A protein has these predicted regions:
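Conserved, single-site charged/polar hotspot
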Residues: 15-20, 312
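Sec-dependent N-terminal signal peptides
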Residues: 3-16
Length: 412
């Protein structure tokens, strides 16, 4: 028995030195075998190919843009890159930066918002704030989203940015980050100011960003009536589509002498979320008619088809050279639905491209493969499959400890 144990121990020592030699060579060479997994993030592609030119819609406005909220696909456009004032639709960016401040912990919905002399002197639509008066951020957001209050927008801008000019700098920086190439903000509320310009396409980008990132904004934009000051101040939503159009959820209206009458309207039906931007309409009724025409077209021409995640998809992959044997997979990048033409008869399928194993180290969130979304044989989009946990590389000390524990078990 002692001879047998001795032989096993010797064999273990030999294995150890062979392991150490191999490990040391791999480390010393500075070379790593590349995993067959995709090494860079797969960017989602346009999920729908428009098969035909859209019809010429009669739109009583200077510019318009209709997009799918999920993908950003442009479904219809009219002078979408023509710069013009956008009035109170400007407040969408003010709201976006405010929700970001809440998300980052800078503010809460209960944070008191002071009213400065500057905010007090705002013209246009307002709730007649008085200097020194305070409302919670939640109340100010109601005033902005429901009544389009300029004084409330400026007061919030001063709270978030320290001053309105500093906040406007943040607005322009954020617009640049979003790719709003033809937008320049000069104030936080949208009053006509020289150089305060945007486009229908840029407004669609801005609207999509806040709706996808902070859908809680719809809690405010969907309010028809409310009150402030203990019921003394009545708020009535400027977006009359809330009462006229099935599925409308928001988002923001705007009217000035320079901009005309405008709206960025969001609506959802049967899982399809659309954003219709109308700029420079001659009247309020024209604004709502144009938005209705755009939304009607979008809901009639397109549908949201459910994306079927394969039932036999791998839930984990093996990892070589790690303390972890496997790493779980994350398919969250795949959308729940995909945009298709309404008449499309093709069935959606998902084709996975994954390696048999990964090479350590693997970090959580790392792209390890991709999922192709197909409609028939046509590729509708590509999405990353990611690691859902870390799998660190096994270092020499860990390997030695594991081998020692194994030898002790054999000797025992």
């Amino acid at each position: 028995m002692e001879r047998k144990n001795l032989a096993l121990l010797c064999a273990g020592v030999v294995c150890f030195w062979l392991f150490a030699l191999a490990f040391g060579t791999a480390q010393g060479s500075g070379l790593r075998r590349q995993s067959p997994a995709v090494q860079t993030a797969v960017q989602p592609q346009g999920p729908v190919q428009l098969t035909a030119e859209p019809p010429a819609l009669e739109l009583p406005c200077r510019a318009a843009c209709l997009i799918d909220q999920q993908t950003g696909t442009v479904l219809y456009e009219k002078n979408a890159d023509q710069q013009m004032p956008i009035a109170s639709i400007t407040k969408v960016m003010t709201l976006l930066l405010t929700f970001e401040a809440v998300h980052n912990g800078q503010l809460t919905m209960d944070t008191p918002v002071p009213v400065s002399e500057h905010a007090y002197h705002m013209g246009g639509s307002q709730i007649w704030l008085e200097p020194g008066e305070q409302f919670t951020l939640d109340e100010m957001l109601k005033a902005i989203c429901v009544s389009s209050a300029n004084d409330a927008a400026v007061a919030v801008a001063e709270l978030v940015g320290g001053s309105e000019p500093a906040f406007v700098q943040q607005m322009n920086a954020r617009a640049a980050e979003l790719g709003m190439e033809h937008t320049t903000f000069r104030n936080a509320c949208g009053l006509d100011t020289e150089g305060h310009l945007s486009t229908a396409r840029d407004v669609a980008i801005m609207s999509r960003t806040i709706l996808n990132t902070y859908p809680e904004v719809l809690h405010y934009t969907g309010i028809w009536t409310d009150t402030l000051r203990g019921g003394a101040t009545q708020l009535v939503n400027t977006n009359k589509l809330l009462r006229r159009y099935s599925g409308i959820t928001g988002l923001k209206t705007g009217t000035t002498s320079g901009a005309g009458v405008c709206i960025s309207a969001s609506a959802t039906r049967d899982g399809l979320n659309l954003i219709a931007v109308v700029l420079g309409a001659p009247s309020s009724s024209d604004r709502f008619d144009a938005a209705t025409t755009l939304l009607d077209y979008g809901f009639a021409a397109y549908r949201a088809a459910p994306v079927p995640l394969p039932e036999d998809r791998p839930l984990q992959l093996k990892v070589k050279g790690s303390t972890e044997e496997t790493v779980p997979l994350d398919y969250a990048a795949l959308p729940a639905t995909a945009l298709l033409p309404a008449e499309s008869a093709g069935q959606l399928t998902v084709q996975l491209e994954l390696p048999e194993a990964l090479e350590a180290p693997v970090t959580r969130g790392q792209t390890v493969g991709k999922a192709q979304l197909l409609c028939g044989e046509a590729v509708q989009g590509e999405y990353p499959v990611c690691a859902a946990a870390d799998a660190p590389r096994m270092d020499f000390d860990t390997a030695l400890q594991l081998l020692w524990d194994s030898l002790r078990g054999v000797a025992a």
